[in-house]
Amino acid sequence: MFSVLISLYNKEKPENLEQCLESLHQQTLNADEIVLVYDGPVSESLKAVATRWANLLPLVIVPLEKNLGLGKALNAGLERCTHNVVARMDTDDICLPERFEKQISYMESHPEVVLSGAAVIEFDEHGKERLKRLPLSNNDIHQFARMKNPFNHMCVVFRKDKVISAGSYQHHLYMEDYNLWLRIMSLGHPVANLPDVLMKVRAGSDMVNKRRGWNYIKSEVQLYRLKLALKQTGFIRGTLYFLIRTMTRLMPVKVMQFLYEKDRKG
């Protein structure tokens, strides 16, 4: 048995939420519980979508009085999840039909694994698609995590008790997930990624532009300090990675777009 954890923000488009929930309904293995957190007040049109699907899905609505941000909203929802195995999803993404069947089966057959993810296909408003794969083995994920986020957050499955023991989600602007993965791995818990493509993820043409600027650099500083504190990397290598990641946040949009495209093709 497993729960699905989703956070809904007022700026989400009703049609995106509709596709998200429809993809959950079309799974070959149905979720036992879908915890949908309203991160602050949401529009009547969004509520209408949720209400309509509540007749077909095991939805548990968790309304928050005000917008708390992704990390705190997910923590509120995590508390309401009644099953220890929890699958994450975002309201603007689409699960492929066999997602839960494959991921839950993997977690059941690998009880030692605390956190697992999968490959995703990113698509934009023009229908252009990019494949995003990540390292599969525990060792390769640890190596990759020194430089980049080793999981597609919207497509992970984890064990609730281990996430809570690692400190749950903590405030880290744009990087709540990366922060949590590092803390989980620092405790020695095995992690993995499946090679299967199990989700389609919206990645608009303005996504690269949103990943620039001083707020992102502040988050990079916080991430750098966390990696050193957890001994995820040494000082020299960690500083080099920090400088590389920070420089990309200051590059012109077209340069960032080129590097992003090259990274996906690689």
UniProtKB/Swiss-Prot annotation:
Keywords: Exopolysaccharide synthesis, Glycosyltransferase, Transferase, Virulence. One of its GO terms (molecular function) is glycosyltransferase activity. Coiled coil: none annotated. It comes from the Bacteria. Pathway: Glycan metabolism; exopolysaccharide biosynthesis. Its EC number is 2.4.-.-. GO terms for biological process: polysaccharide biosynthetic process. InterPro entries: Glyco_trans_2-like, Glycosyltransf_2, Nucleotide-diphossugar_trans. Belongs to the glycosyltransferase 2 family. Involved in the biosynthesis of amylovoran which functions as a virulence factor. This is Amylovoran biosynthesis glycosyltransferase AmsE. It comes from Erwinia amylovora. The gene is amsE.
